[in-house]
Structure formats: C-alpha cells, structure tokens
C-alpha cells in the first residue's frame, strides 16, 4: 500500500499538469481587450489558446480556459495610468 502511494505521488510530480484559468487577458500595454461583440472576444481568446470567451458587461473580453502563461488583469493600471 505504501509503495502504491509513493508511486502515485511520484507520477503526479513527473507529469506536467497544465492548469487552465479564466479572466481578463491583457494586451502588451497592460490594458484589457475592449469589445462590442462576443465573436471578437471568442476569437481573441482562442488566439491566446483559450477555450473561448465573450464580451462582458463592462465591454471587456472575459476568457475561459486560458493557459498559465497568458497574463491576466490583476490591477487597475493601463499604460502606467490608473484606469
């Protein structure tokens, strides 16, 4: 039984587990993608290797299933200014 647990833990550590995350992706300037249509956001999110996305109430793109290496909006700064 102990060997099974040890092998299971070792296998989990060896496997590269890629977690997916949801959120507002940012452009190079640090600003969120602005939008009017869901189709635009869906394309942006899929171009970033996400599962999909939609235009949220505040007219910015919300993406689902993004890889870990895609930066998400974490503060209110855009182009170095508070927005």
UniProtKB/Swiss-Prot annotation:
Q: Which GO terms describe its biological process?
A: defense response
Stored InterPro entries = LCN-type_CS_alpha_beta_dom, Scorpion_toxin-like, Scorpion_toxin-like_sf, Scorpion_toxinL, Scorpion_toxinL/defensin
- Any one Gene Ontology cellular component term annotated for this protein: extracellular region
One example GO MF annotation = sodium channel inhibitor activity
Q: What are the disulfide bonds?
A: 31-78, 35-55, 41-61, 45-63
UniProt keyword terms in alphabetical order: Disulfide bond, Ion channel impairing toxin, Neurotoxin, Secreted, Signal, Toxin, Voltage-gated sodium channel impairing toxin
Tissue expression: Expressed by the venom gland.
Signal peptide location: 1-19
**Compartmental location:** Secreted
Q: Which Gene3D superfamilies match?
A: Knottin, scorpion toxin-like (3.30.30.10)
Q: Which residue windows are coiled coil? A: none
Tell me where in this chain the LCN-type CS-alpha/beta domain is found: 21-79
Pfam families to which the protein is assigned, alphabetical: Toxin_3
Q: Any other comment in the entry?
A: Negative results: has a minimal effect on Nav1.5/SCN5A and no effect on Nav1.8/SCN10A and Nav1.9/SCN11A sodium channels.
Say which family it is in.
Belongs to the long (4 C-C) scorpion toxin superfamily. Sodium channel inhibitor family.
UniProt domain comment:
Has the structural arrangement of an alpha-helix connected to antiparallel beta-sheets by disulfide bonds (CS-alpha/beta).
Its annotated function is as follows: This toxin significantly slows the fast inactivation of Nav1.2/SCN2A (EC(50)=580 nM), Nav1.3/SCN3A (EC(50)=1310 nM), Nav1.4/SCN4A (EC(50)=530 nM), and Nav1.7/SCN9A (EC(50)=1340 nM). The toxin does not affect the peak amplitude of Nav1.7 currents. On all channels cited above, the toxin requires depolarizing potentials to slow channel inactivation. In addition, the toxin has no or very weak effects on the voltage-dependence of steady-state inactivation, and on voltage-dependence of activation. In vivo, it produces paw licking in mice equivalent to the effects of whole venom.
Q: Give the protein name, as stated in the record.
A: Alpha-toxin CvIV4
Native species: Centruroides vittatus
């Amino acid at each position: 039984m102990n060997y099974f647990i040890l092998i299971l833990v070792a296998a989990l550590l060896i496997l590269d587990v890629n977690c997916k995350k949801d959120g507002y992706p940012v452009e190079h300037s640090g600003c969120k993608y602005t939008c009017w249509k869901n189709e635009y956001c869906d394309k942006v999110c899929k171009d970033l290797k996400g599962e999909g996305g939609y235009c949220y109430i505040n007219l910015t793109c919300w993406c689902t299933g993004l890889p870990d290496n895609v930066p998400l909006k974490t503060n209110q700064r855009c182009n170095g200014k508070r927005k």
